[in-house]
């Protein structure tokens, strides 16, 4: 089995968890940023894992556009600041499933936490939260808590995801 991990990363969170996934996968594998998608023949891969950061409760635009070009057996790894048990995370997970299932044989996905970009954190200090992001009363708490992610807890989620889908 040959697996491609292809990711879009704004802050480095998604790149980091995708690199962990790459370490954990047994067998033939390749990892590249989506920007390098034209350097590979996607038809050579049995499995494609798309790494994305969450933007407006879905894959970011670059990853979304790429997923819409696929018709393969795919998986996703997503990173977001919100707690993984939050309603927002559940909505994101379901939106990613819908996106990945449109034209593909979607198999499985996993979300991990990641820190908020410094640029967005700065915007939050200059403008009312509801102008930039849907108003969430505890947004500052979420941002501060997310700052320690991705961490070992997130990497364990990735390891479990890889072991379940690729190494069993």
Model regions and ranges:
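Conserved beta-strand termini and adjacent loop/short-helix elements that scaffold enzyme active sites
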Residues: 6, 32-34, 112
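Short, surface-exposed acidic/glycine-rich loop or hinge patches that mediate macromolecular interfaces
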Residues: 8-12, 36, 53-57
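A short, well-structured beta->alpha microelement
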Residues: 27-40
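Flexible, glycine-rich phosphate/dinucleotide-binding loops
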Residues: 12, 38-40, 83, 118
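FMN-binding flavodoxin-like domain, especially the glycine-rich phosphate-binding loop
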Residues: 24-30, 45-50, 55-168
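Short, surface-exposed connector motifs at secondary-structure boundaries
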Residues: 1-2, 46
